[in-house]
Structures are given as C-alpha cells and as structure tokens.
C-alpha cells in the first residue's frame, strides 16, 4: 500500500487529480474553493460539487481516473491518495 499527498491548483480547465491505475485507489479531497469532480469530461454542469472547505473520500476503481475543474479563477485542492496493491 502506497500513499501520496499533493496540493493541486484547480483552474477552469479540467485536469486529472487521480490518474488511471491498475489498482483501486482511495482518494481523500479537501477543497479550498468551488471544485467540480468527475470523469475526463468534467464540467461545472456535469461534475459533483465540492464547496469551499468540503472534504470527501472517494474510491476510484482500477482503470478509472478522477478529474477536477474550478467554477471560476483558481484555488487549491489537497489530495491524499492511497493505492491498494
């Protein structure tokens, strides 16, 4: 089991925050602004909203990825990922 942490600057351009992997990943998110998460085509219309200060733990199945986009400007998203080998 490997754990990594990062601070991602989320902008109005969607970006990958948990890459495709060959194992299940547990991803802990702490948003510091309005962040929308979802698949590779995530938008502010289709994503799941994390408001400023929200925290979420999500399981990403093998072969899937998680992406994020901001509603406006840019802000930080703290990410802690644990890979289950």
Where in the sequence are the language-model features?
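Beta-sandwich interaction modules
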Residues: 51-63
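Short, surface-exposed beta-strand/strand-loop-strand elements in extracellular ectodomains
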Residues: 30-48, 80
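Edge beta-strands of extracellular beta-sandwich domains
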Residues: 76-83
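Viral virion structural and adsorption modules
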Residues: 2-4, 68, 83-84
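Surface-exposed ligand/attachment interfaces on beta-rich extracellular proteins
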Residues: 1-23
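Noncatalytic modules at the cell exterior or secretory-pathway interfaces
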Residues: 24-27, 60-74
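Short loop/turn segments at connectors of secondary-structure elements within structured domains
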Residues: 4, 73-76
């Amino acid at each position: 089991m490997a754990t990594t942490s990062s601070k991602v600057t989320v902008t109005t351009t969607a970006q990958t925050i948990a890459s495709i992997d060959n194992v299940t990943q547990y991803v802990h998110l702490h948003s510091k602004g309005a962040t929308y998460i979802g698949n590779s085509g995530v938008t502010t219309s289709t994503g799941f909203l994390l408001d400023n200060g929200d925290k979420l733990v999500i399981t990403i199945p093998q072969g899937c990825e998680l992406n994020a986009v901001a509603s406006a400007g840019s802000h930080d998203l703290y990410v802690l990922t644990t890979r289950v080998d």
